[in-house]
């Protein structure tokens, strides 16, 4: 059984957060939105006390700072889709673990494309990890095989090397 995708929305505008939540759930009702956060401080605290979600939707301009400050204060291993009204931060955003950069107002088709991109990338990574594990099993040269065998010959036991 596939685990539900866990998502965090970091957005200081209540209407924008509500609209994004609705659009995500329309795209896939199975996506679990585990937190909606409004500030850098609240986000840093949340990431320090909770496991990283699969995906973060992140506005850049938050009430207390630019969201990039989150990454200076706490390790975030989640994939990120930036959602912002400002295009000037795109290069900086893609230097992080950014999957996409959506300009507000977010259009359904662009959100769907970003979520599909995330699913494709994570599917690719999962397949790559499986292939690597299979390769490691096949090519395991460190594996030790038995060098001695005992066999019964009549009433005696003989050792073979």
Region locations from a protein language model:
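Charged phosphotransfer/docking patches of two-component systems
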Residues: 14-18, 90
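Hydrophobic/aromatic residues located in beta-strands of well-ordered beta-sheets
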Residues: 7, 33-34, 80
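Conserved binding/recognition cores within well-folded domains
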Residues: 120-161
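Short hydrophobic/Thr-rich beta-strand motif most characteristic of the beta2 strand and flanking loop
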Residues: 30-40, 46
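Conserved acidic carboxylate
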Residues: 11
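Charged docking surfaces used in two-component/phosphorelay signaling
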Residues: 18-26
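Non-catalytic signal-transmission and effector/linker regions of two-component phosphorelay proteins
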Residues: 1-6
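CheY-like receiver
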Residues: 26, 42-46, 53-135
């Amino acid at each position: 059984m596939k685990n539900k995708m866990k998502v965090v929305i970091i957005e200081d505008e209540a209407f924008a957060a509500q609209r994004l939540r609705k659009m995500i759930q329309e795209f896939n009702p199975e996506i679990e939105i585990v937190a909606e956060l409004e500030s850098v401080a609240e986000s840093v605290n949340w990431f320090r006390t909770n496991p990283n979600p699969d995906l973060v939707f992140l506005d850049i301009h938050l009430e207390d700072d630019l969201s990039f400050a989150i990454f200076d204060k706490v390790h975030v291993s989640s994939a990120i889709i930036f959602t912002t009204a400002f295009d000037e931060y795109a290069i900086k955003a893609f230097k992080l673990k950014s999957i996409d950069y959506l300009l507000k107002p977010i259009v359904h088709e662009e959100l769907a494309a970003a979520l599909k991109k995330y699913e494709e990338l994570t599917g690719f990574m999962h397949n790559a990890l499986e292939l690597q594990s299979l390769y490691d099993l096949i090519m395991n040269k460190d594996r030790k095989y038995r060098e001695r065998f005992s066999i019964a010959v009549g009433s005696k036991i003989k050792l073979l090397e």
